[in-house]
């Protein structure tokens, strides 16, 4: 699957996550609009690793999200939205 992230979100995600997350990304390319297109084999694994990053780096001692956690949640939501859109499009193409 391919996901389109702003360059800022992509760099933030890479800086605030474990090495395993960058290992799940097969390919990246910068788009004309400055966004980054990332390709992954397993979108579920990518989302799981982002969740791990929220827990490891984005929560305070009382498990409330910090600014890092909120930004990681935003990126998680964006990728999940794009994943659902792609799956819906594939489902509609298969039914035609």
Segments the model singles out, each with a brief description of its role:
Residues 32-80:
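Acidic, low-complexity, intrinsically disordered interaction modules
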Residues 2-41:
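N-terminal acidic leader/helix
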Residues 86-96:
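Short acidic DE-rich linear segments
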Residues 20-22, 30, 55, 67, ...:
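General N-terminal targeting signals
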């Amino acid at each position: 699957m391919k996901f389109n992230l702003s360059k800022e979100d992509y760099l933030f995600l890479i800086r605030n996550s474990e090495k395993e997350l960058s290992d799940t990304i097969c390919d990246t390319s910068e788009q004309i609009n400055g966004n980054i297109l990332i390709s992954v084999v397993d979108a579920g694994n990518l989302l799981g690793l982002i969740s791990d990053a929220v827990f490891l780096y984005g929560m305070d001692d009382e498990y409330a999200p910090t600014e890092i956690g909120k930004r990681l949640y935003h990126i998680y939501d964006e990728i999940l939205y794009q994943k659902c859109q792609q799956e819906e499009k594939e489902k509609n193409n298969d039914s035609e």
